[in-house]
Each structure stands twice: as C-alpha cells, then as structure tokens.
C-alpha cells in the first residue's frame, strides 16, 4: 500500500466582527494515513479561556462543517475521531486514524462571551 501524507491547513477565524480575538495557529500540519494529528489555536483568556473554541473543517469548493464547539461538544454525525480540548488559552483539535477525506482546511473560531443568543 503506498504511503501518503495528508496536509491539514490551519486557518484562524474569528466569529467576532467588532473585536478581533487575536487567535494564532501554525500554518499547516502534515501526517501520514492512520496517524494522529493535533491542531492548536491560542488566543487571549477572555476568548479561548472562557468560551473554548469552535473547530470547522472545509474541503475545497464546499462550505465549512462544524466539528466541535465550546470545547468538546460535537454536532450529531461528527465522528469520534475528532476530539477537541482546551488547556489554559490554547484550544486543540485531535484527529485520530487520519483518513484521505481529512485533508482539508481547519478553522479555529472564537465567540465573544458578551454575545447572547
């Protein structure tokens, strides 16, 4: 079986239009099939520390898909291979057992805690 690398591109996204969250992520992560990749997102304590982060996956030509929100809450239908966590001001998304379809852009998004639904 040929060995393949997956490139996971990380993009920082703030869902707050007035106040930028100041989130930072490494530009990319490359791993082999069936390996584990961990993506990180660091921001200020008012955003990542209080609210956690949402993680989204986007394949080229398709809209973003929500993978996780407020730390490790997964929407229905999202595989348990995607697991989010937070330590201090750093949010992480871990993808286990990487599959070809995991090659995508990943967005870390933060919400302003002063916003209400």
Swiss-Prot record:
SMART domains: IGv
Span list, region Framework-1: 20-43
Domain Ig-like: 22-117
Disulfide-linked positions: 41-108
Region of interest (Complementarity-determining-1), ranges: 44-52
Region (Framework-3): 73-108
Swiss-Prot/TrEMBL keywords: Adaptive immunity, Cell membrane, Disulfide bond, Immunity, Immunoglobulin, Immunoglobulin domain, Membrane, Secreted, Signal
A cellular component annotation (GO) from this entry: immunoglobulin complex
Annotated segments matching region Framework-2: 53-69
Chain intervals for the UniProt region annotation (Complementarity-determining-2): 70-72
Protein name as catalogued: Immunoglobulin lambda variable 10-54
Gene name as annotated: IGLV10-54
């Amino acid at each position: 079986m040929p060995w393949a690398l997956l490139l996971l591109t990380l993009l920082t996204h703030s869902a707050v239009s007035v106040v930028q969250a100041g989130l930072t992520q490494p530009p990319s992560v490359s791993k082999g099939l069936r390996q584990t990749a961990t993506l990180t997102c660091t921001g200020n304590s008012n955003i990542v520390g209080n609210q956690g982060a949402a993680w989204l996956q986007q394949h080229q030509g398709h809209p973003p898909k929500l993978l996780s929100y407020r730390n490790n809450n997964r929407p229905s239908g999202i595989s348990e291979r995607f697991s989010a966590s937070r330590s201090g001001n750093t949010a992480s998304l871990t993808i286990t057992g990487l599959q070809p379809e995991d090659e995508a852009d990943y967005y870390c998004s933060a919400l302003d805690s002063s916003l209400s639904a």
